[in-house]
Amino acid sequence: DSENLDLFINEKIGGLSLTERILLILASEGFSNAGLIADIPEISFKRLKKKYPDFKIHQSKNISDFVNKEDILIFQNNVVINKKQLQSTLDIIKNQKESTTIRGDKNSGILFLKKNISFSDGTNYSDLNSLNATLRKIEPKDSPIKLSTSEIGSNTGRDFLFDHISKNVSGWFSKTINSKISIPISKVLIKTSLHPNVITFIVGLIGISCGIFYAINMPFIGALILQTATILDRCDGEVARIKLRESKFGQWFDTALDQLSYFSMFLGISICMNNPKFFPFTADNIIF
């Protein structure tokens, strides 16, 4: 490409290099191997090796070692992509019969080369800029972005991922209101070493504590605490998706603590309403 890709080797988001992010996403989506074109010998990816020990990386200095053997999908190491965008890219190339460039608002830094590709004009495979100019362009529904050298060390990639972080099942209030508070907090949390499950545990304790305030006839305080926990409950998932630390246990743990928070609320309300000292509610009791 026109960018010097060596400059992006140390570019990270959430403690992960852009290259390792792509490899982790590929592995999580069922890919068993990938080719790595780099001049640096034996690049190590600790998280990838630990989580997917059977994932194979074939490293070479030349793209020609991979071309014409099978269909290949090329990602530059300045591409910022999430799982949904990878799936969108795979969907659009699934039935493609010719090599293409994946494009978004700007060149996304992704090429799809068919097996036995050839150029009559002598286009150099190793020149990504020439390939981009030669190949047909297609655009997926949800496209990734390609960072420029001027964006190295900036928050462009991080902010892009956070802009596309909400789950499809999230409601309007959660996406529109709660996210305005949770995302700035999550942007701070990804700089720490806190595991998403630890965040889940802390938020769960906050949510469960709401029942105490309902039980002692302080429902307004209890409601504020429960709503605070509901907002913060987005943070563990946001951090997990940015750091690529999602897990089935994490999802189960989050759901279990959510249910305990609701149980605590209903139990606290029941205790309050069955206590003659607090029932019936008065304006003073509801507030204080």
Where do the protein language model's features map onto the residues?
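Acidic (Asp/Glu-rich) catalytic motifs at the cytosolic membrane interface
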Residues: L224-S270
